[in-house]
């Protein structure tokens, strides 16, 4: 975020800022009941910063991961138009008084001490409740994933990502080996659902790209043929993950 505020950010800085903001949103949303000191406004402020960062990282992923696969399957070299995200606008946003106040408020909360003396005793129960809910949201549709609407399928991808973030936040309270084993079983779900989602992002981008380059029709055909395969792979990954033993 400092690099963005200084006006020297590149694509990786944008990506890391988006990941950081995503993690914060997950924590504030799923752990909101853990403290009376959490300001409900923070989550929306963070969400707005996230939206302003745009979709440049998604486009980078299509260029570096999806396009090379399509070229390997016989497509001519494809060049996706670059959408310019004005760094100057982002610099102004991240240097604004509102953003600075948000960061300072989050830091003050992070370094504050909880007044409730029974907080530690209640923490494990709160963790179990939060993780149980997220875990259920990830696995509840495992047996009929392929029957869901695409928007519902992508919600499961987001929940899987949030589950990982929340586990990483509280991982120090549990045996490291147990946490790592569980996350290892979650990883295939994230990988397949992530690639499945990328295909739909690519489909939208390629539809627009056909207006200036007809070679993207080949890419569109490849994407449409690949989507059912990744859908089935995602369903299988979810079914396997459903059998994983929870550690909390």
Predicted regions and their residues:
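Function-determining surface determinants
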Residues: 1-248
């Amino acid at each position: 975020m400092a690099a963005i505020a200084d006006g020297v950010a590149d694509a990786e800085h944008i990506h890391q800022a988006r990941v950081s903001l995503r993690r914060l949103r997950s924590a504030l949303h799923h752990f909101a009941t853990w403290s009376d000191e959490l300001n409900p406004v923070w989550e929306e402020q963070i969400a707005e910063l996230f939206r302003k960062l745009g979709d440049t990282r998604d486009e980078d992923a299509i260029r570096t991961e999806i396009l090379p696969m399509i070229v390997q399957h016989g497509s001519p070299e494809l060049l996706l138009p670059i959408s310019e995200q004005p760094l100057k606008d982002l610099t102004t946003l991240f240097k604004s008084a509102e953003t600075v106040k948000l960061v300072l408020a989050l830091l003050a909360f992070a370094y504050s001490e909880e007044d409730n003396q029974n907080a530690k005793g209640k923490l494990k129960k709160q963790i179990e409740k939060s993780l149980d809910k997220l875990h259920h949201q990830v696995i509840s549709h495992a047996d009929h994933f392929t029957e869901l609407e695409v928007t519902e399928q992508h919600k499961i991808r987001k929940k899987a990502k949030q589950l990982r973030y929340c586990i990483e936040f509280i991982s120090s309270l549990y045996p490291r080996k147990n946490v790592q084993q569980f996350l290892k079983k979650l990883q295939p779900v994230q990988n397949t659902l992530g690639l499945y989602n990328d295909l739909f992002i690519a489909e939208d981008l390629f539809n627009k790209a056909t207006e200036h380059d007809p070679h993207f029709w080949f890419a569109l055909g490849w994407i449409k043929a690949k989507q059912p395969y990744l859908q089935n792979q995602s369903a299988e990954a979810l079914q396997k993950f459903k059998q994983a033993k929870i550690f909390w």
